[in-house]
């Protein structure tokens, strides 16, 4: 395959039909820019790109089919012509066996006059189809005219026809997903500084450390103090609960003691009352006895 197949034909101004399209092309100077684009840019990128397309094999197969079919048609036509000539010659020989030569010449002239001369017309070429139409054909589509009518600058045309060889382009979804991981903390020695250089240095004492280290230790101490305070508070709560329970038990014990004392006092009071009652009864008996002794008999 020739290398000219991969190059777009130069755009030339048609002198016969001057229409609005040609005036626009002249106005925006697109003839020059497009021709330069075809000669410079496409010769390097587009040509190498199209050569590696999988459709090249298809174009070759399609070409071989056309060539084989045309050669077979030519062979068939030649064979048919030879057969017809042979049959005509043999038929004329059979008919002209018992005819004098003058009459044979007259008959041949009459046959030539009856059969008008038919010039051999070549078969019209079939328009190419498939990928060959895109690569080899000089057919201009209506959409192509609309593309040419666009008022584009040279840089815009180049960017429009430039092949993107940047490799895989990440979609926006992946970019949004990766934004979450950007705020991670940086690892040590990320910028190439080796750990061996820092290992030789002596460890800094607490006095030599920057303020941030003191702050870090203070924060640890504060955290430990907070934890101790929380433990003390828990202990206080336990003591408070224990004291409350002990006080509550003491109060119950005191109440029981008071209740028992009151019961005993009541019992004692009742006993005292009973004793008083007994004493009163004894006094009454004694009074009765006295009264009985003082009885006088009246005459």
From Swiss-Prot:
Subunit and interaction comment: Component of the Mediator complex.
Keyword Nuclease on entry: no
GO CC annotations on file: nucleus
GN (gene name): med19
Composition-biased stretches (Pro residues): 119-128
Coiled-coil ranges (or none): 260-291
Role: Component of the Mediator complex, a coactivator involved in the regulated transcription of nearly all RNA polymerase II-dependent genes. Mediator functions as a bridge to convey information from gene-specific regulatory proteins to the basal RNA polymerase II transcription machinery. Mediator is recruited to promoters by direct interactions with regulatory proteins and serves as a scaffold for the assembly of a functional preinitiation complex with RNA polymerase II and the general transcription factors.
Compositionally biased intervals (Low complexity): 67-86, 100-118, 218-299
Keywords per UniProt: Activator, Coiled coil, Nucleus, Transcription, Transcription regulation
Organism: Dictyostelium discoideum (Social amoeba)
Superkingdom of origin: Eukaryota
Protein name: Putative mediator of RNA polymerase II transcription subunit 19
UniProt record, GO biological process: positive regulation of transcription by RNA polymerase II; transcription by RNA polymerase II
UniProt-annotated stretches for the region Disordered: 60-133, 166-299
Compartmental location: Nucleus
UniProt keyword annotation of Transit peptide present: no
Compositional bias of kind Basic residues: 176-190
The family this protein is said to belong to: Belongs to the Mediator complex subunit 19 family.
């Amino acid at each position: 395959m020739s290398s000219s197949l991969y190059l777009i034909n130069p755009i030339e101004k048609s002198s016969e039909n001057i229409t609005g399209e040609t005036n626009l092309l002249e106005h925006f100077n697109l003839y020059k820019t497009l021709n330069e684009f075809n000669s410079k840019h496409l010769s390097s990128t587009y040509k190498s790109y199209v050569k590696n397309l999988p459709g090249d094999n298809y174009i070759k197969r399609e070409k071989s089919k056309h060539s084989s079919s045309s050669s077979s048609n030519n062979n068939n036509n030649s064979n048919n012509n030879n057969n017809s000539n042979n049959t005509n010659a043999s038929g004329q020989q059979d008919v002209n066996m018992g005819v004098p030569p003058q009459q044979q010449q007259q008959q041949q002239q009459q046959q030539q006059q009856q059969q008008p001369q038919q010039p051999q017309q070549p078969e019209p070429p079939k328009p190419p189809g498939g990928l060959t139409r895109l690569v080899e054909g000089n057919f201009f589509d209506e959409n192509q005219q609309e593309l040419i009518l666009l008022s584009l600058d040279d840089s815009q045309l180049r960017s429009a026809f430039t092949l993107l060889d940047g490799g895989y382009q990440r979609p926006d979804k992946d970019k949004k997903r990766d934004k979450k991981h950007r705020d991670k903390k940086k690892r040590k020695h990320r910028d190439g500084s080796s750990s061996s250089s820092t290992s030789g240095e002596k460890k800094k004492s607490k006095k030599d450390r920057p303020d941030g280290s003191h702050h870090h230790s203070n924060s640890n101490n504060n955290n430990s103090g907070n934890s101790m305070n929380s433990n003390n508070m828990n202990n206080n709560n336990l003591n408070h609960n224990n004291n409350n329970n002990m006080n509550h038990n003491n109060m119950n014990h005191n109440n029981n003691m008071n209740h028992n004392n009151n019961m005993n006092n009541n019992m004692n009071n009742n006993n005292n009352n009973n004793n008083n009652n007994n004493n009163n009864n004894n006094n009454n008996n004694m009074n009765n006895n006295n009264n009985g002794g003082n009885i006088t008999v009246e005459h």
